[in-house]
């Protein structure tokens, strides 16, 4: 049984599935004429998530654009859907109604910036122009009446790559110079206003051009976590479904890890101190925030790229599509040293949408249910 943590994930899945279905059945060039039809397909006749059905469909249209590859001029994988952003109110420490107006005024004593004042009822107030969000007032309040209200996206981004643009009335913006494409903000946003670009159309184009292996062979390199991703089906069923899509073979990325481990052990013995090159988000993090350690990053390819290189050395006309859980892998595949080996990257949710969209591929198992974890209808057919 396929479960989604939130309705945001379910909506994203529906958009990806419909985009893939049209690309499979009618060709990707027909997508431009089907934007409105897709928007109507994945939403109800009445507004269920936004102020009106028209805004819902406008937001879905933006999701469709990202499902089709997004803004190609923007090198970042993670993008903000401006119209979907709720422009959350200012973050920071705020005094709640739990303030009892005590006479101890510990919050005032703890604040070195003079940001705490009191009204005629002795209720505390914080001057946001003076507050530096140090949190000292919250620590000493005996009633825990001071809380730190943080925007979900900003809270999720530990490297502070996302913020509100200019003022509170503008949508969130991502600093590409800081962003490592980890996707934490995308998962955290309750409005689904942050999304990763999809290359599902690139994958479909490769599969179609291969003509079921008559033109060239398409290899699916899968991350080890595939074993726990499709918990409602046996791994063999998932592999069969992947091959039904037109893949020639399914290869474990773990084989690439063995190749990297062998080479990396020699580099480690030589350098003495070495950091991993396996995770592109981590590598990007080191380069952007700890540039002095760049030379200590392993010079080996990641397991994904290593096994893809091996495949292309043994099958010169091969195309390789990596399938895993990580959005940062999409950014890695665009790197010059990796792009020659990896032709496309899909996430597991995109693979699910691809499987469910293809008329050539039966559902992984009979009676597949799509539900949201914790929802009232969880466990029931939908």
What are these regions (language model features)?
Residues 1-69, 195-355, 362:
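Iron-sulfur-associated redox domains of electron-transfer enzymes in respiratory
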Residues 1-140, 144-156, 160, 352:
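Ferredoxin-type iron-sulfur electron-transfer modules and their immediate structural context
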Residues 86-94, 117-125, 164-166, 184-186, ...:
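Gly-rich Lys/Arg/Thr-decorated short loops/hinges at beta-loop-alpha junctions or inter-strand turns
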Residues 90, 106, 112-113, 121, ...:
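Short coil/turn connectors at secondary-structure junctions
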Residues 101, 105-110, 140, 188, ...:
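Transmembrane alpha-helical segments of multi-pass membrane transport proteins and ion-pumping complexes
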Residues 102, 180, 378:
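ATP-binding Walker
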Residues 127-128, 133, 143, 152-220, ...:
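Conserved Radical SAM active-site core
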Residues 356-382:
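Conserved G1/Walker A P-loop phosphate-binding module
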């Amino acid at each position: 049984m396929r479960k989604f943590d939130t309705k945001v994930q379910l909506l994203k899945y529906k958009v990806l599935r419909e985009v893939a279905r049209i690309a499979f059945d009618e060709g990707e060039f027909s997508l431009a004429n089907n934007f409105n039809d897709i928007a109507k397909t994945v939403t109800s006749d009445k507004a269920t998530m936004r102020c009106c059905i028209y805004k819902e469909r406008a937001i879905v249209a933006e999701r469709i654009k990202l499902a089709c590859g997004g803004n190609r001029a923007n090198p970042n994988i993670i993008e903000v859907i401006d119209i979907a952003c709720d422009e959350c109110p200012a973050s920071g420490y705020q005094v709640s109604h739990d303030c009892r107006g005590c006479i101890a005024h510990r919050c005032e004593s703890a604040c070195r910036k003079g940001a705490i004042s009191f009204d005629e009822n002795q209720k505390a107030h914080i001057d946001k122009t003076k507050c530096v969000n140090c949190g000292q007032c919250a620590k000493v309040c005996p009633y825990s009446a001071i809380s730190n209200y943080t925007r979900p996206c900003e809270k999720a981004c530990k490297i502070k790559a996302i913020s509100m643009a200019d003022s509170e009335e503008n949508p969130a913006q991502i600093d590409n110079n800081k962003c490592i494409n980890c996707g934490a903000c995308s998962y955290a946003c309750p409005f689904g206003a942050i999304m990763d670009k999809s290359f599902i159309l690139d994958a479909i184009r490769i599969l179609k051009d291969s003509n079921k292996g008559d033109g060239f062979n398409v290899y699916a390199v899968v991350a080890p976590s595939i074993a726990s991703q499709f918990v409602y089906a046996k791994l063999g069923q998932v592999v069969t479904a992947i091959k039904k899509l037109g893949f020639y073979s399914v290869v474990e990325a773990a084989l690439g890890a063995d190749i990297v481990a062998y080479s990396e052990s020699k580099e480690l013995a030589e350098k003495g101190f070495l950091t991993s090159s396996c995770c592109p988000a981590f590598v990007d993090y080191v380069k952007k925030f700890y540039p002095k350690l760049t030379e200590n990053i392993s010079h080996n390819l990641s397991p994904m790229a290593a096994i893809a290189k091996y495949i292309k050395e043994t099958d010169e006309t091969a195309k390789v599509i990596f399938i895993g859980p990580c959005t940062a892998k999409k950014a890695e595949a665009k790197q010059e040293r990796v792009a020659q080996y990896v032709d496309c990257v899909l996430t597991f949710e995109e693979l699910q949408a691809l499987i469910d969209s293809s008329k050539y591929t039966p559902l992984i198992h009979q009676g597949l249910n799509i539900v949201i974890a914790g929802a009232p209808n969880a466990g029931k057919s939908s």
